[in-house]
Amino acid sequence: MDGVIESPSNNTIKISPSTSDSSTTTPIITTPPTQSTATVTTKAAATTTTTEASTTPPPPQPTPTPTQSTATVTKEVETTTETIPPIVTKGKIKKSKKSIKKPTIVKRPTTPIDYKQWHTEWPIHVYSHPINGRYLVATKDLDEQTVILRDLPYTWAVDHATCDSVCQHCFLEVPLNQQILPTDFYMCEGCQRVGYCSANCRCIDYSQHRFECQIFKELDTEEYSPFLMSEIKLLVRTLSRKWLEDSITQTAGIDINDETIKKQNTYNQYKNPQSLIPQDNGLRYNDYAELVSNVENYNESLKESLSYWICKYVVKLSAKLGKIEDEFDLLNILLRNRCNAFYIQGRPRDGSSGESRGCGVYVRNSFFNHSCDPNVNYWVVNNTLEVECTLLKNVKEGDELTISYIDTTSPLNKRREKLLEGYLFNCLCTKCVADESLPLDQTGTLEKDDDDNDDEKEKMDEDDDEKDDDINNKNDKKSKYKSDGSTDDEEDEDNNNNKNNNKNKNNNSNNQDHQNNDKSN
């Protein structure tokens, strides 16, 4: 790879030189270029200024023939020297072409992305297994805390519960003081389902939100839970991204898989790549569609589930926009998001880890397989959408790189239950295999669920309450008059009389027995 184009927040384009050594990594966030690697505009301006200020006439040059290559050079110079007022003549074009060595601009990857080129940027490589699918391995020995990957999501959505405090475009969380007294947060006036931290973010995201706004407007948030509403928003957000790519392709009149797209990309497109697709990371819908959805592992009852009816409802709403979609295709998208989405945590407060701001589907991060003893951890960079993956331990060349999908502190049966329910596989990692040899009470098999413990505790409390009620009732009876008007003293006297009567009855019965015995004798 000859170079990587960066688009920092100040809207300046920096071209970082790449190294010829494939073993060295080139991070996405690069340092500003040195003096020898300047921008194209700076070089063109410096050359033009030198040519005009020079008093010595240039050496005679052969008159260039008006070929196609000359016209191409003229177009490139005019495009890359937008800040130079004078018009460059043909003679100067020839001199500029000879003196300026334009850096080669690496085109953004088109579909399908070549994941085999990752070793030129990051020390990882993608392999495929017939059963386990694609997975990542280290291409060399790496130390702990080494950054092995940074990634942006293909699709993302803000949680419905935080849509009034998290920007839909950049995922910036509004400070707490502005959440109480909002001043600079812009909610969409059409649907009131998404908001933005600035007018610039709202303007950039409009190219995609214009598709989903009409659908969000039709959704009744009171009919769905916040979790389900967030899932619907991610589904619609993925659809709108797909429609945006289709509209760009139709407007350009070219096939997105056509090789000619590489020739028609201009420098201005890389100068502001967000003008076409928000948060463009070079991925397209075909790359997203290759992710696993596990739809084949679901039974026929899925067609009667709520997810299927949600997809049918979204299909009807899409038809109002002139977009023809199939229920089964939308079901694939919904299940694909469930299997591959990463929750994006918010800013920690009061010692907590922070609530979820939303979720996103990171295509490259989805290649990490699960392990209950992972060697890679990931987190969000500076309250944005970018995710950084670092090593938790030293790894050797060829070792598989894994992350954890669940809480690994849970016992064995709880971990496997979570993975089977959410990801439809039974974990056989080294930690799970080792835990199988533990006693049953340590694997969690004999442990009672929290709900069972709560029920048992409530039952014990009820028994204690009943005992207390019995004691209180007895005390109340002693302190109150009886229904016949007798007091406690009279009650005691009656009890004594009853005891005496019982004794007399017993004596009479004994005397009767003696008489019977005498008769028999």
Curated annotation (Swiss-Prot):
InterPro entries: H3K4_H4K5_MeTrfase, SET_dom, SET_dom_sf, Znf_MYND. Coiled coil: none annotated. GO terms for cellular component: nucleus. Residues 1-101, 442-521 are annotated as: Disordered. It is an enzyme of class 2 (transferase). Zn(2+) 2 binds at C188, C191, H209, C213. Residues 91-101 have a biased composition (Basic residues). It holds the Pfam family SET. Gene3D superfamilies: 1.10.220.160, 6.10.140.2220, SET domain (2.170.270.10). A zinc finger (MYND-type) spans 167-213. Its EC number is 2.1.1.-. Keywords: Metal-binding, Methyltransferase, S-adenosyl-L-methionine, Transferase, Zinc, Zinc-finger. Residues 56-65 have a biased composition (Pro residues). Residues 12-55, 66-90, 497-514 have a biased composition (Low complexity). The keyword Zinc-finger applies. Zn(2+) 1 binds at C167, C170, C197, C201. Residues 122-406 form the SET domain. Residues 448-469, 486-495 have a biased composition (Acidic residues). One of its GO terms (molecular function) is methyltransferase activity. The keyword Zinc applies. Residues 470-485 have a biased composition (Basic and acidic residues). One of its GO terms (biological process) is methylation. Probable methyltransferase. Belongs to the class V-like SAM-binding methyltransferase superfamily. This is SET and MYND domain-containing protein DDB_G0292140. The lineage of its organism: Eukaryota, Amoebozoa, Evosea, Eumycetozoa, Dictyostelia.
